């Protein structure tokens, strides 16, 4: 969503971390993992100052079930690339206007969700909380009941079609309740730092038994 600019700061931090030639941790991760990165899913919406839609007026995170090239070309081409390359891990980065927390929403509503799926989600969330005190696991969206996943959303579509850990990361617009910084609130440097932690947690996830 183009109005959720904290996601752009997160992405800038992620790219800086991954591409830093002096970072031994990122070099080790890149030896094992190939990252396919979409820096901005909605450049037209960003350029036009939209909150949630692209130039055609479509909310792209409700177009993943059957995107059309004339309405949601951004989703269409990314879905095609995913089908061609495959997906083993997926993180969709957003901001939430109402909840003053950093949290992750999983896709528990998928019909095939099982104990293994839950263990993967729990491992990643808990590891991220260990790495970064700005992230927490106590507050977030309530999980959907089995069979009620929204497959028009990126996480639901990817989790359903690729059977991988698929998540949505949400960050606050103003500040975090548990770790507030009143002088700056939730800002670019904190978004970047969270990106670094997310990537470290990716490596730990693939090192763990739960990712198998």
Each model region followed by its residue ranges:
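Active-site/substrate-binding loop(s) of hydrolase catalytic cores
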Residues: 1-151, 156-184
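His/Asp/Glu-rich mid-to-C-terminal helical/loop segments that flank catalytic regions of hydrolases
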Residues: 176-212
